[in-house]
C-alpha cells in the first residue's frame, strides 16, 4: 500500500477496500446512539481514480429520534459533506424514520450535517455501488424465511437453561451488574425471575451495546423496536404481552434473548480490543489499513461535528490536517514493517539463490553417478547371493545346535546320577561314625537351647518395650512441664511479675526454669538398640535429660528452681488481694459511668423509637403502594393472559369447528354410500335365503316321504316277523303237547 500527501490532498491506493460500498444487509448491529450525523468526504482532486474510504453505520436509526436538517452548500471542493457524486443511491435504501422518505434528493445533497443516519447519503465508492471495490463485508445477513422463524437452540432443555443461565450470571458478576444497576437479582433467577429482574437485565445489557441510549417508555414498548434494530433473528416470536409478563412458560425464550445480547456485547468488546485481528491475519485478510482509516474517520468525524456550522472550508481543512497527517504517519509505520519484511525476504532469496548455485557447482557429473549406480546394483546382486548362502549356513548351524542340546541333556542326566552316588557314599561314611541316638540327643539339646534363647529374647524385648514406654511417658511429662512453665512465664510477664524489676514483682525473681541435664550420655548407653513407636532409637540426647546421673533420676523439688507452694503461692495471694482492692475501686467508677451511659441510652432510645415510628409509617405507605402496584400489574397480566388464552381457544375452536363440519360431511357421504351398498347386499341376501329355504323345504319333504316309506316298510317287516315268530311258537307248543299226551 502507498500513501500520497500533497497540500491536504490524500488518497489510499490498495488492491482492496473494506470500508467503501458497505452493503446495508450486513448482520453487524451498531448502537443507535452512533447514528447521529452523516458526512462524506468527496473527491479531493481529479488526479485520483478512487474516492476516500469511509465507513457507514450498520444499524437502523432509533424510531423515536426526530430528523433535523441543516443545509449549506458553501465550501471548497476539497472537502465535501454531501453525497459522493456519480453514486447510484438507489442501491442504498435508507432505513429512515417515518417521513424521512419524503425529503427531496436535492436537499439531502446540500445538507452539511444531519443528526439522523441516512445510508443513501454516504457511500464511499465513486460510481460503483456496493460492489465497486470488489470487497464486501463478510458479515452478510442471511435472507429471512417467511413467517415466524424457529429457534434451533434447545431452550426448553433444563441443562441448556442452567448452562446459559450460569454463563449469564458469571458475565453479570464479572462486570458489576448489581453495583451499576443498584439491584440484586432474585435467588432463583435462572428458573423463576421477576419482571423487575428482566427489566434491569435488558436495560443493562443494552447499555453494554449502546451506552448512550436512554430508556423513556415502558419496557414492552421499548423492547420490540430495539430487537429489530439489533436484528435479533427470533424477535417475531416475542409479543408485547409476553414482555410485560416475563416468567413461567415463556421464560426460556427471554433467557435465550438475554444470552444472545450477552454474546453480542462480548463480541463488540472483543472487536474493540482487536481480539479478532489474529483470526483475520490467519485467514489472509490484512486489516491494518482498515483500522488506520477507521481511526482517522472516527476522530476526524468527531472534530468535524464539533465545529461551528458557519465554519469555512479553510477551517475545516485546518481541523482535518492533523488527522490526515496522523493517518499518513500510521501508514508509513505500517509500510515500514512490510518494507523490513521485504528486505528480509530479499536477503533470504539471495542466500537461497547462492546456495542453489553452490549446489549446482558441487553436484558431481551425472555419468559418474550412473556408473556408481550400476556398481551398487551389481553389489546388491552379490549381497543377495551372499545372503542366500548365509541363510543356508544358518539352517545348518541350527541343526547342529539341536544335536548339541540333546547331548547336553544326556550329560545333565549323567551328572545327576553321579550326584546321587556321591550322596549315598556320604551317607555310608556318616553311618560309620555317630549313632542315631547321639544325633537325636544333640538335635533335642539344640532345640531346647534355641527355645531358651528365644524366650530370653522375648522377655528382653518386653522389658525394653516397657522401659521405652516409661521413658516416653516421662519425656511427655517433661515436655508438658516445659510448656506449662513457658505458659506461666508468658502470663507472668503479661501481668508484670517477671522480671524482678516488673511492677508487681516487688524485687522478687518469680521466673520458673526447668533444671535438667542437657547432654550427659548416662541413660543413652542402656537404651542402645531400643526402638520407639516411630522406629527411631530411644537412646540419645533427648533421653539423657531424664536422669540426673547414670543411676538416679530427678526429685520433684529439683526440677524447678522455685518453691511453688511456699514463696510463689504467698506472692500470688498478696498480689491477688491488691488487685481485688484496685478492682473494687475501678468497679465503683465504672458503675457511675454506666449510670450516665444508661441515661444517655434512654434518651437515644426515645429518639430512636420516634424515628422507628415514622419509619414504620413510611414503610407502611410504601408497602401499600407496592401492593397496589403489584395487584394492578397482576390484574393487567392476568387479563392479558386471559385475553390471549381466549383468543387462542377461539382460534382453536374455529379450526376444530371447520374440521368437524368437514368430518361430518365426509361421514354423511360415507354413510349414504354404505347404506346403498347394504341395501343391495340385503336384497341379494334375501333372494339367496328364499332360494335356500325352498331347497331346504324340498329336501325336508323328500326326507319325510323317505321316512314315511321306510316306516311303512318297517311295519310290514315287523308284522311279517311277528307272524313268523308266532307261527314257530305255536309249532313248538304243539310239539311239547304231543309227548305229554304220550306219557
Swiss-Prot record:
Pfam families, alphabetized: Ndc80_HEC, NDC80_loop
Keyword Transcription regulation attributed: no
Region annotation (Disordered) ranges: 42-71, 88-150
Coiled-coil segments on the chain, per record: 326-493, 590-696
Biased composition (Polar residues): 88-107
Listed GO MF terms: microtubule binding
InterPro entries per UniProt: Kinetochore_Ndc80, Ndc80_CH, Ndc80_sf
Domain of life assignment: Eukaryota
Subcellular location as annotated: Nucleus; Chromosome, Centromere, Kinetochore
Key words, A-Z: Cell cycle, Cell division, Centromere, Chromosome, Coiled coil, Kinetochore, Mitosis, Nucleus
GO biological process, one term: mitotic sister chromatid biorientation
Gene Ontology cellular component list: Ndc80 complex; nucleus
Record's subunit section: Component of the NDC80 complex, which consists of kpr-1/ndc80, kpr-2/nuf2, kpr-3/spc24 and kpr-4/spc25.
Physiological role: Acts as a component of the essential kinetochore-associated NDC80 complex, which is required for chromosome segregation and spindle checkpoint activity.
Family membership: Belongs to the NDC80/HEC1 family.
PANTHER family tied to this protein: KINETOCHORE PROTEIN NDC80, KINETOCHORE PROTEIN NDC80 HOMOLOG
Protein name (Swiss-Prot/TrEMBL): Probable kinetochore protein ndc80
